[in-house]
Amino acid sequence: MLKLERSNINNWNVPISMFVECAEERMTKVVPVSDAVAQIADGAVVTVSSSSALGCPDAVLAAISARFEATGHPQNITSLHPIGAGDVYGVKGIDHIAKDGLLSRVLAGSYPSGPSSAEMPQIWRMIVEDRVAAYNVPSGIMFDMHREAAAKRPGVLTEVGLDTFVDPNRQGCAMNERAAAAPIVERAEFGGKTWLYFPNISPDVAIIRATTADERGNLTYEHEGAYLGGLEQAIAVRNNGGLVIAQVKRVTANGSLRPHDVRVPGHLVDYVVIDPDQKQTTETLYNPAISGEIMRPWSSFSVPEHGIEKVIARRAAMELKRGMTANLGFGISAMVPRVLLEEGYPDAVTWAIEQGAVGGMPLTGFAFGCASNADAFVPSPQQFIYFQGAGFDMSFLSFLEVDVEGNVNVSKLGKKPYLTAGCGGFVDITAKARNIVFSGWFEAGAKIALTEDGIKIKAPGKFTKMVDEVEHVTFSGRRAREQGQNVIYVTERCVIALQGNGLVATEIMPGIDPQAHIVGPSQGRVQVAENAKIMPKALLADAPMGLVL
């Protein structure tokens, strides 16, 4: 038998089969996945650690589905997903359990999303057809709920989400009629202030993922792109007398894991199941640069192609100063670190993303939510505490639509709901952020030419993103004004400031006619300041713009 010491746990040339063989002979917590999921009772509240495909315990979710198909159990479970499980590119995640009779209620920070060309995920069909009570709860609040349940406190009291769709004065997180009929949040007065109160939902089962387990169930995360919330979810379940199932890539003997590397101690884990083929993240089996095992040269990162979205990202980047810490979201905003790279500032700003990476270069595309060359990986629950308390200097986020109050929607598209994942950590991040830069298109579908002299509008768009009232309030402009938050919206035509009298364009892109291209298309919802400036033409050049931080 192979004896695995600390010295050879880091030798990744050892065949996985040897780890598995060792586990089968000596480790009582390692069981077939079918045996582990057989312990999940009808009506259980099941919490899942995942962020799309990143850290997704997909084999366990698939086994729950298989058991249900074979036996009709477990029935009517509630599923909790602080961030979201699965994607539309081969890791089914929550879609494994999106079945009538199996899933009766789901609370998630986000849901699988994809392009309009992709098939609608099954969980979205259930939501739209009102076959499951579905809620979109900010990711940070969901982690808070686990912490409060673990400590046997009555629930979460928070200002996060006030005057947004999270607020019961609006939708109260409900995504359909079944959810609206069973509220999970209420308003409360305490200490002379208004709060949102989320009563505890105590989890019975935790399904988490790591890279390696030893015979006692101690878990390490050396191949993972983030820790996510596995520890907090396991504690919440253990403290409520429940069951913790950990999916790992391999198993090793006791004593071979360095204590400082163990992120979830074995006394919290009941069963370990092995999936040697678990993907690190979407479309990625394993990349050591994502897990921080190697550092990439800055020259190996691509810079954005020349185009309108890059111009928007460049203007957003001009808000930064050297030494800042900034939060980063999906969409056009995700290009901002690459703009800094092209300008010669690869590490002048510390980036913090909700999955837990701090510093380095946030990745884009399928690897969004991960970073290479990170300074640190922070568990997601702690990252969200940092976000909710606005410890960072600036946040770069995107928008689907903006209304006259400055409200932003990123969480709902009624016609094609699966094109957006929901709110994720957006509400937590923006609740008290001191400085917010939203980036997006002023109009959808306009024909635009980009020249070194300016933006040329050749044909108007199908519709403006500046509307009377957003479909879903993910960010409250009214509350931002009350709190004195500094908010701007960067578009291909102008920079808009949220002011006391509404939306005011304070900077105009070269080539843009303020009346014809801003006031007119927005039907007066965006006004132009008398002293509005013209943005520098360097933003438009197909070359570095000479940014100075």
Please place each PLM-identified region on the residue numbering.
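Conserved phosphate- and dinucleotide-binding cores of soluble alpha/beta proteins
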Residues: 2-20, 24-38, 52-68, 86-298, ...
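Glycine-rich phosphate/ribose-binding loops and adjacent secondary-structure elements
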Residues: 37, 65, 75, 303-305, ...
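Short conserved AdoMet
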Residues: 41, 239, 321
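Short glycine-rich or small-residue beta-strand-to-loop segments that form or flank ligand, phosphate
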Residues: 45-50, 78-82, 107-110
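Short glycine-rich phosphate-binding loop at a beta-alpha junction
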Residues: 46-48, 325-329
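Helix-coil boundary and N-terminal low-complexity module in membrane systems
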Residues: 73-80, 102, 135
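Hydrophobic/aromatic residues located in beta-strands of well-ordered beta-sheets
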Residues: 77-79, 244, 326, 351, ...
